[in-house]
Curated annotation (Swiss-Prot):
Keywords, alphabetical: ER-Golgi transport, Golgi apparatus, GTP-binding, Lipoprotein, Myristate, Nucleotide-binding, Protein transport, Transport
Gene designation: Arf2
Biological source species: Mus musculus
Cellular component annotations (GO), alphabetically ordered: Golgi apparatus
UniProt record similarity statement: Belongs to the small GTPase superfamily. Arf family.
InterPro entries recorded: Arf1-5-like (IPR045872), P-loop_NTPase (IPR027417), Small_GTP-bd (IPR005225), Small_GTPase_ARF (IPR024156), Small_GTPase_ARF/SAR (IPR006689)
Pfam entry (one): Arf
Top-level taxon in the UniProt lineage: Eukaryota
Residue numbers binding GTP: 24-31, 67-71, 126-129
Name of the protein described by the UniProt record: ADP-ribosylation factor 2
Lineage: Eukaryota, Metazoa, Chordata, Craniata, Vertebrata
Length: 181
């Protein structure tokens, strides 16, 4: 009987954990986002070869965020990070019109993976501070997000350097985690 109360108490008050995989094409802003969330400041980044991993505490949830390099030569390695991923953050450079179709292809390929079938999808439309940036509606269309009928997804306009939109995205992720059984 005590076990029932312990489980109830943990579900109501215990810290939840969520494993997040953050991917996207190179130079989309993934590492800048990770360290803005972790440290609250802008860090000087270099292209990620391999990965960065940090734990971000937010609203009683411990997000373990894996930031995986996005250069085309290392994208085949993304699949090694899929296992046990509950949330996928796909970062798009909203100013990079030439590569938005490439981003769509990579996202489509990933979402077809069986290991990610239950992962929720958060798309960060990054670099909204730039004058020619595509807005969230335009990116939704270009990525074909409306065709994702079997997946819970959300799109959020962001600016990694100022932090705009990042916590709104984490709010959505935390609500998804709370709604999971």
């Amino acid at each position: 009987m005590g076990n029932v109360f312990e489980k109830l108490f943990k579900s109501l008050f215990g810290k939840k954990e969520m494993r997040i995989l953050m991917v996207g094409l190179d130079a989309a802003g993934k590492t800048t986002i990770l360290y803005k969330l972790k440290l609250g400041e802008i860090v000087t980044t270099i292209p990620t070869i391999g990965f960065n991993v940090e734990t971000v505490e937010y609203k009683n949830i411990s997000f373990t965020v894996w930031d995986v390099g996005g250069q085309d030569k290392i994208r085949p390695l993304w699949r090694h990070y899929f296992q046990n991923t509950q949330g996928l953050i796909f970062v798009v450079d909203s100013n990079d019109r030439e590569r938005v179709n490439e981003a769509r292809e990579e996202l489509t390929r990933m979402l077809a993976e069986d290991e990610l079938r239950d992962a929720v999808l958060l798309v960060f439309v990054n670099k909204q501070d730039l004058p020619n940036a595509m807005n969230a509606a335009e990116i939704t269309d270009k990525l074909g997000l409306h065709s994702l009928r079997q997946r819970n997804w959300y799109i959020q306009a962001t600016c990694a350097t100022s932090g705009d939109g990042l916590y709104e995205g984490l709010d959505w992720l935390s609500n998804q985690l709370k709604n999971q059984k």
